[in-house]
Regions:
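Short hydrophobic alpha-helical segments enriched in small aliphatic residues
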Residues: 13-15, 25
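Compositionally biased, low-complexity intrinsically disordered regions
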Residues: 6, 15-17
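Residue-level detector of intrinsically disordered terminal segments
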Residues: 10, 29-30
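Anion-binding alpha/beta catalytic cores of soluble intermediary-metabolism enzymes, centered on
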Residues: 30-296, 301-364
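Short, small-residue-biased leader/transition segments that mark boundaries at the very start
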Residues: 1-6, 24
Length: 364
C-alpha cells in the first residue's frame, strides 16, 4: 500500500506544483530554491536556538519548522509563558525543547564559562548571572558555544549589533577567517542573470566602509557561501561606479586594490573587477565594456564597495524586482549564528533557520 500512497502523493505534489507554476511563476521559483535548502537541512538535522520567544513570529516559525522537520529547536524563555503565548497564537510548539535560564541545570556552567571567557574584561560571576538570566541572546550563544546547540537565529526584535555582539565576544571568528561579514541571498524571479536569478550580495549588512584587505576577505567568504547555498560555481564581481578604469577616483582605487588582493589570495576563484553592475551581470554589456574578462556579464556574487551601496542594492532588488532577500546571513563566525531583519515574517525565519542548518552541516 505504501507504493500506492507514495505515487498518489507524487501525483498530488505534481498537480499542485503545476498549479503553482501556472498561477504564480515567481513563488514557484522562490519556493523551489528555498525548498532545496530545506531538504538539505532535513538530510542531517541540526539543533537551532531561537531566543526571541516573546515575539509571535518566532513561535509561528517554530510551529512550521517542527511540522516540516527542518531542525530541532530550542526555545529560550519561561516555559509557562512561552506555552501560553503559543497557545494564544494557535501554534503547536510541543516538539521544541524550552529552556528557562532561571531553572535550567546548565545555567551555572554557562555562568562559569562566560566569566572565564570575559575575564580580561573584568566580568564577575554576578554580572555573568545577570546577563544570562535576562539577555536570552547571550544564553542562546552560550548554548552554541558549549555544544548544546549547533546554531542560533535571532534579530526579529533586536538590532544586528545586539545580535552579533555576543557572538563576537563568545564564539569569535572561524579559524582562517580575518573578518566577520554579512551577505544577502537574493532570488530574483524570471531573471536570466546570475544563477537563474540567484545571487549573493556582500557585504550588505555589517561592515560600514571596508578597506581593500577587508573587501578582498568579504569577496572570498561570499564566494564560499554562494557555493554552499546555491551549489554552483561562484563568479565574483567587485562592483564600483567604474568599469576597468572608466572613472578615476579614490573610491575606485580601493576596489581596484581589493580586486588585486582577492585574486592573489584566491587564484582559483573566478573573480574580477572593477565593474559597474551592468558590466558584471549583462553578457552584452560585459563583452563591450570589459572584453576578455572571465567574469564580465556572468557574475553571481556581487561585492559592493561599502555598506551604503550594499544595503541600497539589496533593497532595490527586493522592492523593485520583487526579489526574495534572505539575510543578513553572517559568514566568518566560528559557529553559525544568523541575524534577521526586524521586518521579517515567520516564513523568513523558517528560511533563515534552514540556511543556518546547512551552514552547520558544512562545519561537520
Amino acid at each position: 500500500s505504501s507504493d500506492v500512497c507514495s505515487s498518489d502523493l507524487e501525483m498530488d505534489t505534481y498537480a499542485s506544483s503545476q498549479r503553482i507554476t501556472v498561477t504564480n511563476e515567481r513563488s514557484h521559483l522562490i519556493m523551489g530554491f528555498i525548498d532545496v535548502i530545506k531538504e538539505r537541512a532535513k538530510s542531517s538535522i541540526k539543533t537551532i536556538v531561537l531566543p526571541e520567544t516573546e515575539d509571535m513570529r518566532t513561535l509561528e516559525a517554530a510551529d512550521k519548522i517542527l511540522k516540516e522537520g527542518i531542525a530541532k529547536l530550542v526555545l529560550v524563555g519561561n516555559e509557562e509563558a512561552v506555552k501560553k503565548s503559543a497557545a494564544e497564537g494557535g501554534f503547536d510548539i510541543s516538539g521544541a525543547q524550552i529552556v528557562d535560564p532561571a531553572t535550567s541545570e546548565k545555567t551555572q556552567g554557562y555562568i562559569d564559562k562566560l566569566v572565564e571567557l570575559r575575564q580580561k574584561k573584568g566580568m564577575t560571576p554576578e554580572q555573568a548571572k545577570e546577563i544570562l538570566l535576562n539577555q536570552y541572546l547571550y544564553y542562546g550563544v552560550m548554548m552554541v558555544k558549549m555544544g548544546d546547540a549547533d546554531g542560533m537565529v535571532s534579530g526579529a526584535c533586536h538590532s544586528t549589533a545586539d545580535t552579533l555582539r555576543p557572538c563576537l565576544q563568545i564564539l569569535k571568528t572561524k579559524p582562517g577567517t580575518k573578518l566577520v561579514s554579512a551577505f544577502f541571498l537574493i532570488i530574483v524571479p524570471d531573471c536570466e542573470y546570475g544563477a537563474n536569478g540567484a545571487f549573493v550580495f556582500g557585504d550588505s549588512g555589517l561592515n560600514q566602509n571596508p578597506n581593500p584587505e577587508e573587501l578582498a576577505a568579504i569577496a572570498a567568504s561570499s564566494a564560499e557561501s554562494f557555493k554552499l547555498l546555491v551549489q554552483e560555481e561562484p563568479v565574483v564581481a567587485m562592483l564600483s561606479h567604474s568599469t576597468k578604469g572608466s572613472a578615476k577616483h579614490a573610491d575606485v582605487d580601493k576596489v581596484v586594490e581589493a580586486t588585486k588582493i582577492a585574486k592573489e589570495q584566491n587564484p582559483d576563484l573566478a573573480l574580477d573587477g572593477e565593474f559597474q553592475l551592468d558590466a558584471a551581470i549583462v553578457p552584452s554589456v560585459g563583452a563591450s565594456k570589459a572584453p576578455g574578462s572571465p567574469v564580465a556579464g556572468k557574475a553571481n556574487v556581487l561585492i559592493f564597495p561599502d555598506l551604503d551601496a550594499g544595503n541600497i542594492g539589496y533593497k532595490l532588488a527586493q522592492r523593485l524586482a520583487k526579489a526574495e532577500a534572505y539575510g543578513p546571513i553572517t559568514q566568518g563566525i566560528a559557529k553559525p549564528v544568523n541575524d534577521l531583519s526586524r521586518g521579517c515574517s515567520a516564513d523568513d525565519i523558517v528560511g533563515v533557520v534552514a540556511i543556518t542548518s546547512v551552514q552547520c552541516q558544512a562545519q561537520d
